[in-house]
Amino acid sequence: MRRKIIIVIVVVVLVIVATITFFVIKDLQQEKSLRKEIDEIQKEMVDFEQIDVDKISKKLKATVTTGDYAKIEKAIKNYMADNLNTMLTISEALNDEVIPNALTAENYQNDGPDFVKTRKILKNTQDKLSASKETMIILSKDDTVMSYLKNVDDSYYIDLYKEMVGEESSVDDIKKNIDDIVNLIQSQQNVLEFLSENKNMWNVQNGKIQFDDDILLNQYNQLLVDDK
């Protein structure tokens, strides 16, 4: 009888050990899968000019883990998706051909003298960039980062999330770059406003703008200097 009891105890212990081992291994595999998944996405997002948006978007919507790991994965991916969308908005605004062509003789002829179309597009671009800058600032804050993680109380998973997302990041360089571009666009707006206000005092000849008044020419040239 005693021997049977010992055997039962041994079996129970082995089952418990096996169960614990199974879940430990499963957890390790899940964490490994999570780290690999996020690392691959981050690498694909490094070269933003060559980014495959559709491919990354699909990865950001899918999950490769379960349980609390899936909660972490979804939180990280939702955070990355919002960052990606903001960067895409900035990229789209910067790639608009109106910015480099706003102060060309061709545009003066096509959209002058009031430049309604050009000025509207430039204003929309300014607004998009300014809004995106504010979004980037908000996304960089710790409170915002943590708001993506929901229904997770275990400190281990919370710490893992913090580690993988990273601490509050600085967006000073991004802010400065956006501010510089917004200021550049505003300088272009100033030039177009000047030309619109003096619409009867200039024209385009042989691909160059000509003024009827040297004072206006000097003012125009000064505005161009301010634009650089």
Model-based region annotation:
Residues 5-7, 18-113:
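Leu/Val/Ala/Ile-rich N-terminal alpha-helices, chiefly Sec-type signal peptides and the beginnings
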Residues 1-3:
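Short, Lys/Arg-rich N-terminal segment immediately upstream of the first membrane anchor
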Residues 23-36, 72-91, 118-140, 162-174, ...:
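Charged, low-complexity, helix-prone segments enriched in Lys/Glu/Asp/Gln
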Residues 189-228:
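Extracytoplasmic/luminal low-complexity segments enriched in Pro/Gly and acidic/polar residues
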Residues 96-205:
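Extended amphipathic alpha-helical interaction segments
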Residues 12-15:
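Beta-strand-dominated extracellular/periplasmic modules and repeats
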